Regions:
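Buried hydrophobic positions in well-ordered alpha/beta secondary-structure cores of metabolic enzymes
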Residues: 1, 57, 72-75, 101, ...
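NAD(P)+-binding Rossmann beta1-loop-alpha1 motif at the extreme N-terminus of oxidoreductases
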Residues: 1-36
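A structural alpha-helix within SAM-dependent methyltransferase catalytic domains
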Residues: 7-10, 67, 91, 113, ...
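Rossmann-like NAD(P)-binding element
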Residues: 21-28, 39-99, 107
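Rossmann-fold dinucleotide-binding core
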Residues: 102-156
Length: 156
């Protein structure tokens, strides 16, 4: 799902940083994104060239590379321990002004928001699958989600 989310944002002209612990995942992600973009391009010749879109996506195995991000969207497997580890590491590097979202469909947004120092900047941002095709995203507030956070994601 993370590849599709990265593709959606890159297609909207955002520079995207993808983090994973495995370099092998990146090869799969690159291939999946390029294939998807080529299919979309064949259906709509007016669309931007796939290479230009995929060039906006960078891949990192060092989470410190995300320190300058304004938005972080977690899309790990639905395993609370994995999500907890990601948010714990993320808490030490992101700016206090960064927004944090989870693509979860299983866990409480309020519970996940407690894993970062700024729960008011945390939200659920659940993409339907596949993200590049399904133009539907659930925006889910937690108990501590600030209205500015909700408004920001609603307008994305």
């Amino acid at each position: 799902m993370g590849s599709g989310i990265a593709q959606v944002f890159a297609s909207c002209s955002y520079c995207v940083k993808v983090y994973d612990i495995s370099e092998n995942i990146f090869n799969i992600s690159r291939k999946r994104i390029l294939t998807s973009l080529q299919k979309l391009k064949s259906k709509d010749p007016v669309k931007e060239m796939p290479d230009r879109i995929s060039d906006r996506i960078s891949y990192y195995t060092d989470m410190n590379e995300l320190a300058d991000c304004d938005i972080f969207i977690e899309s790990a497997f639905e395993n609370f321990a994995i999500k907890e580890e990601i948010f714990h590491k993320l808490s030490g590097i992101l700016k206090p002004t960064s927004f944090v979202a989870s693509n979860t469909s299983s866990y409480s947004i309020t519970a996940l928001s407690q894993l970062i120092p700024y729960p008011e900047r945390f939200i659920g941002f659940h993409f339907m699958n596949p993200p590049p095709i399904m133009e539907l995203i659930e925006v889910i507030k937690g108990l501590y989600t600030h209205e500015k956070t909700f408004s920001f994601f609603w307008k994305l």
